[in-house]
UniProtKB/Swiss-Prot annotation:
The gene is cpxR. PANTHER family: REGULATOR OF RPOS, TRANSCRIPTIONAL REGULATORY PROTEIN CPXR. One of its GO terms (cellular component) is cytosol. It is found in: Cytoplasm. Gene3D superfamilies: 3.40.50.2300, 6.10.250.690, Winged helix-like DNA-binding domain superfamily/Winged helix DNA-binding domain (1.10.10.10). This is Transcriptional regulatory protein CpxR homolog. It comes from Haemophilus influenzae (strain ATCC 51907 / DSM 11121 / KW20 / Rd). Phosphorylated. Keywords: Cytoplasm, DNA-binding, Phosphoprotein, Transcription, Transcription regulation, Two-component regulatory system. InterPro entries: CheY-like_superfamily (IPR011006), OmpR/PhoB-type_DNA-bd (IPR001867), Sig_transdc_resp-reg_C-effctor (IPR016032), Sig_transdc_resp-reg_receiver (IPR001789), WalR-like (IPR039420), WH-like_DNA-bd_sf (IPR036388). Residues 3-115 form the Response regulatory domain. The lineage of its organism: Bacteria, Pseudomonadati, Pseudomonadota, Gammaproteobacteria, Pasteurellales. One of its GO terms (biological process) is regulation of DNA-templated transcription.
Length: 227
């Protein structure tokens, strides 16, 4: 049974969602603000559902604090039409963003998709335990990436993007392939979430000696590892 942390200041909605999630077989704990969520945060949670608009500490600030100490998958619950919240959430390392009001079945489907990915970091991407390149090492059994033995603190999406690029050995990996393999959905014209995850990955990777970057963008084609 997967344990979830649901964070929302709307007590009535929290109770309704808790009931829904428990009927789907999840073990749900709740928090009504960001400070309470941070106090409860521990390694036993498989996913955090995090509302944006909350008193004391809003969802964006709470996400920042979570990412300082944990790579637990986070789904942001945003107000419909508030694109800035969605963009900020993805930039700060959220795994997904779902606008309110949402369809119950879509919420459950997205939660299960995130849990599938996080449960198997090497799912459909690699059948080896370790993959190394120029100081970077991917540890598939733990789903972590290190550089010179220092944890890069990548999210699940960032880890899988880096894995595909390292395995490509300099060949182009299309945006369509990244979307299907990493996010398990086809690429759509106006969805910029993949670009946000790639941008976050670039920021987390250290500077390379004698080379401008770890991977390059090929306009209209995709991305390729700089070997």
């Amino acid at each position: 049974m997967s344990k979830l942390l649901l964070v929302d200041d709307d007590i009535e909605l929290t109770e309704l969602l808790s009931t829904l999630l428990e009927l789907e077989g999840f073990d749900v704990e709740t928090a009504n603000n960001g400070l309470e969520a941070l106090q409860k945060l521990n390694e036993s949670y498989k996913l955090v559902l995090l509302d944006v608009m909350m008193p004391k500490l809003n969802g964006i600030e709470t996400l920042k604090e979570i990412r300082k100490v944990s790579n637990v998958p986070v789904m942001m619950l945003t107000a419909r039409g508030e694109d800035i919240d969605r963009v900020l959430g993805l930039e700060l390392g959220a795994d997904d963003c779902l606008p309110k009001p949402f369809n119950d079945r879509e919420l459950i489907a997205r939660i299960k998709a995130i849990l599938r990915r996080s449960a198997s970091p090497s799912n459909n991407i690699s059948n080896v335990e370790i993959l190394s390149f120029d100081g970077i090492t991917l540890h598939f059994s733990h789903g972590i990436a290190t550089y010179n033995e220092e944890n890069l603190n990548l999210t699940d999406y960032e880890f899988k993007i880096l894995c595909l690029l390292l395995k490509s050995k300099g060949n182009v990996v299309s945006r369509e392939e990244l979307s299907l393999e990493v996010m398990e959905k086809p690429l759509t014209p106006f969805d910029r979430s993949l670009d946000m995850h790639i941008s976050n990955l670039r920021r987390k990777l250290p500077k390379r000696k004698n080379k401008p970057s770890w991977f390059k963008t090929l306009r209209g084609k995709g991305y390729a590892l700089v070997t």
